Amino acid sequence: IDEGRWKMAAPKFPANAHRHDPYRNFKFQILIDGKPVAGLTRVSALHKITEVVEYREGGDPSSSRKLPGRTEYRPITLEQGVSHDPVFEKWANLVNNLDGDAAMSLKNFRKNIVLNLLNLQGSVVKSYMIHRCWVSEYSALPDLDANESVVAIEKIVIQNEGWERDEAVSEPTES
């Protein structure tokens, strides 16, 4: 075997050589206006898709080239157990409320939010800044059913204009 061809992959967790398992998906936090949102039960995936633009040159009619086109950032759903925390309702009402268009907040309805992924010790391991978000859907209560015994969930769907990982957040040393 030619040793020069086989190189070791970079460690997945450079600050924690003992660690082999990836992070879990059940410890996370969302910050809206710099404050953590209590009781979140679910955040949908951060997902972007770039359309493909096909391009053919006249001198090469047998194949086409594929170029990146417009990138779309998919909506993000946030869910929390119903409580007396008004953060979802107040944000949704900045876009639309019973007082009509005049009550819409043209200044404050868009917010930059932060999504933090936490390790099992509760330390931030990855952080994403989500830009220019606004609420496009709001569910104050779920379907109510006397034959079920489940937690009532409040939900918002937010539109966004892009997200990026906060490179300043690095892997914390675990104990």
Please annotate each region the language model reported.
Residues G4-S175:
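Glycine-rich, low-complexity intrinsically disordered segments
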